[in-house]
Amino acid sequence: MDMGHWYVYLPLRRLGHEVYFYDTVEPEEKDYKKIIEEFKPDLIYCCLTGNKSIAPHEPWKEILDETNSGRTKTFNWFCDDTWRFDNFSSKACSYFSVCSTPEPAYIEKFKSIGYDKILLGSWHANSEIYSPKSFSERDIDIGFVGTPTLSRRDYLVDNPIPVEIIFNVSTEEIFAAHSRTKIGLNLSVNDNDPEGGTQMKQRIFEIIAGGGTLLTQYHKGIENFFEIDKEIVTFETMEEFNKKAKFLSKNERITKSIAKNGYQRLLDEHDSKIRLSKLLKQIEEI
């Protein structure tokens, strides 16, 4: 099931909204214009990628027509601005009434090209679909949920620190794995970025929603969302990762305290319902 179902559709329904979920991979009704005319939405909430290989039914023309008509607000949630701003986001944003970026530093980049209707759209996680276990019940000491790509081998395979890798599993098993993990590892480098840069990852919020301690590769701007060394732990080098992973593994009291603080911050500010409610209000005000 698409993460949009768990992190957008279900929370919006919980907030009391009537929502039509259009699957851009294999939609039940392929005539998007027909859907608009029948459903008559107040807002068209999108996460369009421009990648036909993964989402062959993205309705770009229909979205642009609706934006230009002025009768319905259209919105796009951009995900990968650190490496797709120049060749995608900077061009696609004009199709929508308003857009968001997960990168604080990219707000000004959008404005510099004349697109002012840009919002900071923080990643978030739906706490209602996780079942955090007590630390004594957690059977994964250090875990990484994701594909062990070549760039991640140094941390996941060629390293004396044992990391349990969870991949090629169902979405429900991903939620369960985060809820069973004491220390959740996030690697922020994006393999699709030719320059090997880091970016904000949804995994950051998923680890914390599962109740574990987040140990994450540092990415500029993460301190806008969590307090470093109180709610999360960051590293920039392999040596720093090894040192902090060993420390957290040997000091469970501190590890549990950081996990508790991070989880409370997520519930207060980064739970899907809270983030989406705030985002909808910002969209309405534009």
Give the positions of each predicted feature.
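Nucleotide-sugar donor-binding catalytic core of glycosyltransferases
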Residues: 1-39, 46-63, 85-90, 94-228, ...
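Active-site proximal beta-strand in glycosyltransferases
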Residues: 65-81
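Short conserved AdoMet
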Residues: 69, 227, 267
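A broad detector of short, well-ordered amphipathic alpha-helices
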Residues: 179, 205, 243, 253, ...
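Conserved acidic donor-binding segment of nucleotide-sugar-dependent glycosyltransferases
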Residues: 232-238, 247-252
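Catalytic phosphate/metal-binding cores of nucleic-acid and nucleotide-processing enzymes, i.e., regions
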Residues: 238-246, 262, 272
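A charged, aromatic-enriched C-terminal amphipathic alpha-helix characteristic of glycosyltransferases
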Residues: 250-281
